[in-house]
């Protein structure tokens, strides 16, 4: 099948899957923002817990990305026994990841939330919500792994079905558990947390069934979960940059929360906008998850033409998606503010929408670059782009701009401009890396 058609066929389900993943957080915030009492504090609490939620997803998805690329390459080489070991070791890693999240949920959440706020109501809500999400995190972790196993064998439609089921369960349960309907008592933010984790578990269970029944290219057996240091090293050689890339997103949001601690309304507005931004950029992440196995498979076959087609169409489709995202966020910022019932944060939220959305085009291209790098074993280049986007440029710029905002010399909107500036610089560096990779790995 031609690469352009294959990318559409594989990409659409993945894009929908990633977009629906972002729906979990958007739906929670929308329902929480419309609570009768304490909605402002609740929205602020969800903003503060968001970095840890992203970190859990980052580790799960990053491990899955490494598994995805390695599994696709191994199957391309016709090695079904190693493919079974790759799948089994990914599940072993999932168990380890869950244990870490469980321990943090029991012992670490209060200290984490306390570092970002002194408001007792926000602290109580944040701790309650995050503890539930961490202690019952096995759903999101194993969903992320099963999703990538299905995607690696070209069955991305089934991973999307699982995501849809989880999203629907979450949306149905949110109003029931947050507001209290029928015999279910009103639980507020705790209800939002329970609705989220139940939706994640529903997705994971369904994908487990699909994995066992449909992925026949390799054997399924508990014996393949026995840890193999070589395979784990290969998984993380590919997946670690993806983990770091998304973990850096968590660090960035956490530090931005600290930077804007001087203005809780702006802090909340940034958290709300980030969920909208995540929805848009997850379109690029979804397409990246099609770009990576397509190019990785072609790289394993040594097909220069298919590698170059994968790069070309991956970038073209990403740019088209990001232009659509910019149009929606620039035209309808007020509608999103109303959805979240943003209250005192409304003006800050709209200004963030207007400015930061300008960065989407360059951010999407950077995400596509990273998918290309990972497919051809150029994980270091992917890591450098992540560091530039999420740490090296953005945080110093935001810190400097916040100094002017705190002093009253400029408005909070100045901080938002750090995002477009950062993405443009990272995109230029990414283009240099791409030219070098084409010369040394594709055309050589």
Language-model segments: which ranges?
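N-terminal transmembrane alpha-helices
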Residues: 2-38, 51-66, 70, 95-102, ...
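Short alpha-helical transmembrane segments in multi-pass integral membrane proteins
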Residues: 1-11, 71-138, 184-240, 295-359, ...
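Short runs within selected transmembrane alpha-helices of multi-pass transporters and secretion channels
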Residues: 64, 133-151, 159-167, 192-207, ...
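Interfacial/gating helices of multi-pass transporter permease domains
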Residues: 9, 32-54, 121-125, 189-190, ...
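Transmembrane helical elements of multi-pass membrane transporters/channels
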Residues: 9-28, 132, 166, 199-203, ...
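Helix-terminus/linker motif at the lipid-water interface of multi-pass membrane proteins
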Residues: 19, 23-44, 113-120, 176-187, ...
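Transmembrane alpha-helix boundary and packing residues in multipass membrane permease domains
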Residues: 14, 18, 30, 69, ...
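Small-residue-rich hydrophobic transmembrane alpha-helices
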Residues: 43-103, 140-159, 269-333, 363-377, ...
